[in-house]
Amino acid sequence: MLAVSNEIKIVIGSWGSFNECNERAYGSKWLDLADYSDWDEIEEELKAEGFELDGMDEELFIQDVDNFPSGAANWDYVNPQEFFELLQEADVLDDPGKYDVMMAFIEVRGYNEFKDRVDKYGSRWDDDIRLYKN
């Protein structure tokens, strides 16, 4: 199902806290990725929430995702920093039109092909894709 908003949000967890079943085992608060200009800001947020990024919490994963196809990837194995930087490079966090194209593309072609296109073409990943709406 297509989302109605390009406000992609994630919950970031760490394998260390998850395995320890400590207070961070359920991950961060919901992070709206459009609210952050770079990964350093997200790291600061995680540290403010008590994550020990140079210790127990150095191995991060995506625990939950909103406004993105949840079945598009095995989120346990997607690095949150790489995901954030991919979405930034694709311009989908700032451009609702690109977001709509991405959602349709992933529904038809899959997350890995989307990632490959962004890796190859950067923000011009969608230059040859046309999305026609009713």
Place the predicted regions along the sequence by residue.
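Acidic interaction surfaces
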Residues: 1-134
